[in-house]
């Protein structure tokens, strides 16, 4: 029986990589250096090892699959979607619950998004696995991240 070896690489994206300064490109719009949004310690070295594995042993792999985290600019899990009840910004790593939205502590910036946002929060909470976490903008479709 022939052996099947499938490599799965999960979200190997710039926004998750602790890139050394020399690997970070210049932002053509601002002239500043682009920074990863959510760097994971050791990820750059991990991906260098994955690249070496593929280089040296790729012929022995049956398949390679790669997942990507991808978000639109306006995403329910990003600060750009939300505001606090007083109108101020919601900071990354804020957890938002449906009851807080119903009480007016947090609101979508677009009032027309309220019913859908509440339905989503209710579904998350009913499933009992997650509460909504507001993440820094990351892995935006079409961006360097």
Regions found by a protein language model. Name each.
Residues 1-145:
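Active-site acidic carboxylates
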């Amino acid at each position: 029986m022939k052996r099947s070896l499938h490599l799965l690489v999960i979200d190997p994206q710039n926004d998750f990589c602790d890139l050394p300064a020399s690997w970070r490109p210049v932002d053509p719009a601002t002239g500043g250096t682009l920074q990863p949004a959510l760097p994971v310690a050791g990820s750059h070295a991990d991906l260098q090892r994955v690249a070496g594995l593929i280089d040296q042993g790729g012929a022995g792999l049956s398949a390679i699959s790669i997942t990507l985290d991808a978000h639109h600019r306006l995403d329910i899990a990003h600060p750009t979607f939300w505001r606090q009840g007083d109108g101020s910004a919601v900071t990354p790593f804020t957890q938002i619950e449906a009851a807080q939205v119903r009480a007016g502590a947090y609101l979508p910036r677009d009032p027309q998004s309220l019913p859908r946002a509440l339905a989503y929060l209710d579904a998350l909470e009913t499933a009992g696995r997650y509460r909504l976490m507001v993440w820094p903008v990351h892995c935006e479709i079409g961006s360097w991240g």
